[in-house]
């Protein structure tokens, strides 16, 4: 298994939808979660870069699909946050369409990291994301973020509860706790990404370049 240097991760581009993304080759691992689940903080902690992914004080600001390259043909994708109530309905629909299209049609997508606040896990949209990934044979890592907000006993109890709950999806779903503040769970995240990037089959360029 190759140990990738996530500190070398760099921003490639932002795209409003799948049509504006670069060619569908290599391996992509996407990060998804509700607007306040700590997605940007997790990406910054993973890569040890303070501002790789912009953390917004206003949840729901990340409206674009953001691509980052870890190594040649190995990319991390920051998907638009979902489930934020104060976003105009039309904008919400636009994001959901872009999100759904990416998840459904992007061949190079081979792993999905679903982030959820440990204090509010497995909301409806989180479950839909996991269900969709399992149906598409995509491996899932659930990160229960902001784990530092709970005492050790409560943290373990919630971790076990969520691990038990995801068995119902009958898929490749792993659950871990994570804290950007305390750097907790970062090694587990890196290990999982290393495994995915090493073992998954990269999508090759087709001859006509499509």
Curated annotation (Swiss-Prot):
Disulphide bridges, residue numbers: none
InterPro entries registered for this protein in UniProt: G_ENGB_dom, GTP-bd, GTP-bd_ribosome_bio_YsxC, P-loop_NTPase
A Pfam family assignment: MMR_HSR1
Entry GO MF terms: GTP binding; metal ion binding
Residues noted as binding Mg(2+) in the record, renumbered to the chain: 40, 62
Cofactor(s), names only, from the UniProt record: Mg(2+)
Family, per entry: Belongs to the TRAFAC class TrmE-Era-EngA-EngB-Septin-like GTPase superfamily. EngB GTPase family.
Name of the protein in question: Probable GTP-binding protein EngB
């Amino acid at each position: 298994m190759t140990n990738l240097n996530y500190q070398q991760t760099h921003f490639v581009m932002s795209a409003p939808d799948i049509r504006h993304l670069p060619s569908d080759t290599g391996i992509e691992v996407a990060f998804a979660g509700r607007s306040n689940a700590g997605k940007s903080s997790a990406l910054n902690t993973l890569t040890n870069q303070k501002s790789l992914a912009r953390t917004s004080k206003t949840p729901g600001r990340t409206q674009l699909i953001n691509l980052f390259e870890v190594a040649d043909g190995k990319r991390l994708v920051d998907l638009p946050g979902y489930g934020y109530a104060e976003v105009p309905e039309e904008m919400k629909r636009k994001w959901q369409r872009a999100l759904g299209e990416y998840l459904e049609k992007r061949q190079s997508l081979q792993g999905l990291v679903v982030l959820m606040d440990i204090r509010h896990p497995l909301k409806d949209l989180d479950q839909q994301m996991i269900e969709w990934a399992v149906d598409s044979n995509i491996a899932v890592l659930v990160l229960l973020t902001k784990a530092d907000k709970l005492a050790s006993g409560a943290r373990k109890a919630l971790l076990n509860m969520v691990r038990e709950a995801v068995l119902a999806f009958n898929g490749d779903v792993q659950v871990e706790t994570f804290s950007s503040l305390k750097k907790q769970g970062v090694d587990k995240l890196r290990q999982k990404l290393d495994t995915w990037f090493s073992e998954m089959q990269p999508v090759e360029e087709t001859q006509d370049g499509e």
